[in-house]
Amino acid sequence: MERSTPDSTPVLGDVFKENTAVAHINNDFSATENIANLVTTESVASEPPVLLADAGSASSPAPAKSVSAKAVRSILVPPSAHLKYDIKGEVKGFPYQVRGDLRWAQDGKTYDARMEISHFLLGSRVQTSTGQLTGHGLEPTRFGDKVRSEVAAHFDYEKNKVTFSANTPDAPLLSGAQDQLSVFMQLAAMIGAEPRGFPEGSTLPFQAVGPRSAESWVFTVGATEKLQMPGGDVSALRLWRDPSGEYDPKVEVWLAAEVGFLPVRIRLTQPNGDFVDQQWRETQK
């Protein structure tokens, strides 16, 4: 197996001073995609998943209901936080363990998110998202994805399009669009504002922008489960996104009130059984 090493050490942008939740009233909304690709490096294979934990569920699902942009009534942006994760996965039968680091900062007007997955032999992968905070929640302006060199997506709200540094075709920018990282913070803001406002079986549709394209993602709301994480036992709401294509991964995310409804677990499962399982280890002050 060839070892790969990043060409430089990614640096987190300025961390905002305030560390408080920001509430907004929302009159319309929409958005979605994935943090899953973070572990992928040239030496590890494509798009492995992230996390494991024993979990129990309860209550029978309610009738499915799609919660669109205009159905979301309020937003509670989570306070700034620094979460660390233990990550285990498997690629083509090769098991591995790495560490994850999520830095989320917001000052009530703008936000900065950074997720890094790293290994001393395999190098690191970093995704970043920056943008504005509005009455609808997060409004990304730039999404970056870096292994050795960075590729990025830029959100042009005046021209209603997304452009890509990878020279792939522009994509139309839909109302409420998120990127593959900001979508998890947007979910946190939506669920945090109305923890009981999304019945089991509800669906949350998003346009999710990656480094080279934009896709449609739909998350389904599941039950609240008790998880045994490296950082302790937590109760978390499970949501998942089923594959929409032959090679798409299944994405599962668990959001916990204990950390402002930021993800305490993310699991990505490839059609061939490869997976990445990312579990919350600690919250740094």
What are these regions (language model features)?
Residues 186-197:
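Beta-strand/loop-rich accessory regions of lumenal/periplasmic or secreted enzymes
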Residues 161-186:
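Acidic/charged, solvent-exposed loop-and-adjacent secondary-structure segments enriched in E/D, K/R, S/T
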Residues 1-159, 199-285:
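Acidic, serine/threonine-rich low-complexity disordered tracts
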